[in-house]
Amino acid sequence: MTLPNVEWAVSPGLTPYQPALAFMEARAAAIAAGEANELVWLLEHPPLYTAGTSAKAGDLLSPDRFPVYETGRGGEYTYHGPGQRVAYVMLDLTRRGRDVRKFIQSLENWLIGAAAQFGIKAGIRDGRVGVWVDRSGGREDKIAAIGVRLRRWVSFHGIAFNVDPDLSHFGGITPCGISDPRFGVTSLADLGHTVDMADFDTALHLAWTEAFGPVRRADAPELVPD
């Protein structure tokens, strides 16, 4: 039986941002050159903020609270930290018809499918990137963010799903540039679901196979320290 070319790796502990970014860029280049397999890489970061290509300076409300990193992904400011599952998705879209819209829809379906395994009805919203859930009083909260970049038709960056992060840490930014008080952030824990990261990863893996197809397990990347 031929093994799938997409690898699935999970890094333990907290992964520093800059070595992770350097690895992603190198791996994406190797995939584009036909020298490496595609990869879905799951990790957690220490508390930090990242700025996408559309980030506005005024949306960084507490610039000294956590480290801030400029990144080439799409989107605005977001928070990463413990209790949030980040998945960096390095896929060759040339092998998938170079259909960016379909790729983003598949990422959305992946996250919606993972949430559904915990009884959470999540969905997308017109004009607002990511995956959202309805709350009381007409509120809607984001449970997962999407921000990707393409280089030579290979994706990198990816998604961030709030399992049980400290939601107060989002207060140092205007998340994704949305200041309307009707729209906030939430997590599995905030919605009343106590889920450890290993169990969430199992749900994420199953939802991936439904949205994208099979993967094979791989060792966590070895990173070059800062």
Swiss-Prot record:
<dbReference type="InterPro" id="IPR045864">
    <property type="entry name" value="aa-tRNA-synth_II/BPL/LPL"/>
</dbReference>
<dbReference type="InterPro" id="IPR000544">
    <property type="entry name" value="Octanoyltransferase"/>
</dbReference>
<dbReference type="GO" id="GO:0036211">
    <property type="term" value="P:protein modification process"/>
</dbReference>
<feature type="binding site">
    <location>
        <begin position="73"/>
        <end position="80"/>
    </location>
    <ligand>
        <name>substrate</name>
    </ligand>
</feature>
<feature type="binding site">
    <location>
        <begin position="158"/>
        <end position="160"/>
    </location>
    <ligand>
        <name>substrate</name>
    </ligand>
</feature>
<dbReference type="GO" id="GO:0005737">
    <property type="term" value="C:cytoplasm"/>
</dbReference>
<feature type="site" description="Lowers pKa of active site Cys">
    <location>
        <position position="142"/>
    </location>
</feature>
<keyword id="KW-0012">Acyltransferase</keyword>
<feature type="active site" description="Acyl-thioester intermediate">
    <location>
        <position position="176"/>
    </location>
</feature>
<comment type="similarity">
    <text>Belongs to the LipB family.</text>
</comment>
<comment type="pathway">
    <text>Protein modification; protein lipoylation via endogenous pathway; protein N(6)-(lipoyl)lysine from octanoyl-[acyl-carrier-protein]: step 1/2.</text>
</comment>
<protein>
    <recommendedName>
        <fullName>Octanoyltransferase</fullName>
        <ecNumber>2.3.1.181</ecNumber>
    </recommendedName>
</protein>
<comment type="function">
    <text>Catalyzes the transfer of endogenously produced octanoic acid from octanoyl-acyl-carrier-protein onto the lipoyl domains of lipoate-dependent enzymes. Lipoyl-ACP can also act as a substrate although octanoyl-ACP is likely to be the physiological substrate.</text>
</comment>
<dbReference type="InterPro" id="IPR020605">
    <property type="entry name" value="Octanoyltransferase_CS"/>
</dbReference>
<keyword id="KW-0963">Cytoplasm</keyword>
<dbReference type="InterPro" id="IPR004143">
    <property type="entry name" value="BPL_LPL_catalytic"/>
</dbReference>
<keyword id="KW-0808">Transferase</keyword>
<feature type="domain" description="BPL/LPL catalytic">
    <location>
        <begin position="34"/>
        <end position="216"/>
    </location>
</feature>
<feature type="binding site">
    <location>
        <begin position="145"/>
        <end position="147"/>
    </location>
    <ligand>
        <name>substrate</name>
    </ligand>
</feature>
<dbReference type="GO" id="GO:0033819">
    <property type="term" value="F:lipoyl(octanoyl) transferase activity"/>
</dbReference>
<dbReference type="Pfam" id="PF21948">
    <property type="entry name" value="LplA-B_cat"/>
</dbReference>
